[in-house]
Amino acid sequence: MADCIASLACDRFEMDAWGVDVMIAGSQKGLMVPPGLAFVFFSEKAAEARRALPRVSRYWDWTNRANPEMFYQYFGGTAPTHHLYGLRASLDMIRAEGIEAIWDRHERLARAIWAACEAWGQTGPLELNIADPALRSRAVTALRIGAPHGSDLRRWVQDHAGVTLGIGLGMAEPGAPAWHGFFRIGHMGHVNAHMILGALGAIEAGLMALDIPHGSGGVAAAARVIAAAS
């Protein structure tokens, strides 16, 4: 089973080729739709395993939703009509760009962000949470910077540049001093080079304004990655 909530339409995923039996995803990440829709894709092997079960809770059973007698049964009730309109627009955008091009774009922009973060981390506390690039998400980058720098930086870029950075999830208990030492950069869905370079510029300005030790040339490193891919 694969959790693709934060990666669908961002990271390469080939369900059949990779032998995945069940995949779950949500609407609010790479599909660019507000939260509220969930998706379950399953293979024939998984369907056979379901049919062999003597008893299944209707809450978890996908059978009725996969083969409904009436349209509303896809959703277990009233259809989320406006979400479906949004999903239609999103899928049209994905089809127009092409999934291979979308995967390439996310790869390129992710590598630009990593280059910036690695440059900043040459001198100072900033480090990527995942050291191996092959294991990193192409949709979101989690960073460690030490408390209280994470919260201070998020606040500064929000107040002075209008950029919202994510909090660290699962890195420390909420309320603990260490909780303030992390942040995330989201780069999923309808994002492009000028959005990423603008966000990185805001972060670099925040590092300077707050006197957080960091290496120089983060934005330039990102620009080189983008330029090399053109």
Question: Predicted regions: what is each one?
Answer:
Residues 1-17:
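Catalytic PLP-binding core of fold-type I/II PLP enzymes
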Residues 1-4, 23-26, 33, 165-168:
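General beta-strand structural signal in soluble alpha/beta enzymes
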Residues 16-28:
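Conserved active-site segment immediately N-terminal to the catalytic lysine
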Residues 28-116, 230:
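Active-site C-terminal subdomain of aminotransferase-like
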Residues 97-105, 121-132, 168-169, 210-221:
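Flexible, glycine/charged-enriched surface loops at secondary-structure junctions
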Residues 126-198:
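Conserved C-terminal alpha-helix-loop-beta "cap" of PLP-dependent enzymes
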Residues 177-230:
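PLP-dependent enzyme catalytic core of the Aspartate aminotransferase-like
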